[in-house]
Structure formats: structure tokens, C-alpha cells
Amino acid sequence: MPRGKLIVIEGIDGAGKGTQTELLARAFQLRGVPFVRFSFPRYESSFGHLIASFLNGDFGPLPAVDPHLSALLYAGDRFEAKADLEAALNSGQAVVTDRYIASNLAHQAARVPAERRPEFIAWLRQLEYGTYGLPAEDLVIYLRVPAKEGHRLVGLKSARSYTAMSRDLQESDLLHLKEAALVYDELAQTPNWVTVECFDAGSGKHRTPEEIHREVLEAIDSRVLSHAGK
């Protein structure tokens, strides 16, 4: 049986990852495409509980937490899910994830001085893909929005299970989101990434979820499903 494809939806906070993951799941259901859906971090996991504490500020303000340590929490959460990820892929199902390794790379590297980022990213890639042996993505869809717009949209979100705050530790820091967006832009140069512009700078408006979804689906059809015997 052909191995399934790992499709990841990425972007800074407020980019619309949850919405696009849901729309993609509905599209796959309508098409009869077998798939399994994941969302990281998984706040119910043992590492996820610690991530929630980190995002709630229980370990101190963002600059007080070494990014190597916070990176270990997010990587550990994925490592706990590795068996489920591999089982789904080995059964031939598509795996759709809302965030994956790139989120860790972007958000933790954003807190490292620019001159040290390449070294940090190399270390974290080795940890997640090498030491932990997590499966590599077949396609990463990068939902690109300006940090200021993402920050605004986060404020419109409904309550989340892991925090009572309207914005968690990372979401509340606009400078952090700007730096994370810069790292994402660098990561997006990777061949298996597709960038979807979600904000129309000309009109100053966010594109509709349906417009974005059509572009996401086109990328998946051309880059992944067309090579999987669709």
C-alpha cells in the first residue's frame, strides 16, 4: 500500500490555520479521501500541559524562558504522537496537521539573535527529524499574513481550552510575531512549501476563507494528490 501524504498548515498566530484545516477536512470528506487530522500542540498530552503553563506565563515572561527549553516541550509533544502519525501514514491515509515542526522552528528561533538562528534551526531540525525520527512533510501550506494583522485577528478568537487570557504569552507580543513571521518567510523558501497570501495589501483586507481554501486545495491537488494516484 502506498504511504500516505503528510500535509501541514502553517503560519503565525491569527493566520487562519484552524479554519483552513477544517475546510480541508470537509473537502477530503466530500471527495472520499481517507485522512487523519492532528493539531499541535496537543494540550491534553503530558508535554502539552507544560506548554500550556509556558504560554500562560507560569514559567515567567517570554524572554525569561530559554528557547531551547521551550523547543523541547513542543518537540516532545510531537514525539508522543509519532506512533499515531506513522500508523496513519503507513495505512495509506493522508495526514493533515494544524501546525507541525515549522511552528517550533519559527516561534523559538524568533527569540534567538538573528546571527544565531541558522545554528538554532539546524539543532532543532536534528532533534525533531533526526533524534526523534518524526516524519518529514510532503507539503507545507504557509498562510502568510502581516504580523500586525495576525495580532489583530487573535484578539477576535473565542476562548481556548489552555488559557483564560485573550492572548497567550506569544500572541500578546507583537514584536515576537514579527520575528516569527520573518523566520517563516525564510523557511518558506524550502521546495516542499507553498505560500498562500492571505492578506490583500492593496485593499487592506483579509481574503475570504473560501478564496484561501481554493488556493490551498489547488496546491494540494497539484503538488501532492496528483502524485498519489488521485
Where are these regions (language model features)?
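Extreme N-terminal, non-catalytic leader segments
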Residues: 1-6
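Hydrophobic anchor at the beta1->P-loop junction of P-loop NTPases
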Residues: 9
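P-loop (Walker A) phosphate-binding loop of NTP-binding proteins
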Residues: 12
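Conserved lysine of the Walker
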Residues: 17
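Hydrophobic positions on the alpha1 helix immediately C-terminal to the Walker A/P-loop
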Residues: 20
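NTP-dependent small-molecule kinase module
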Residues: 25, 148-230
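ATP-dependent small-molecule kinase phosphotransfer cores
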Residues: 30-132
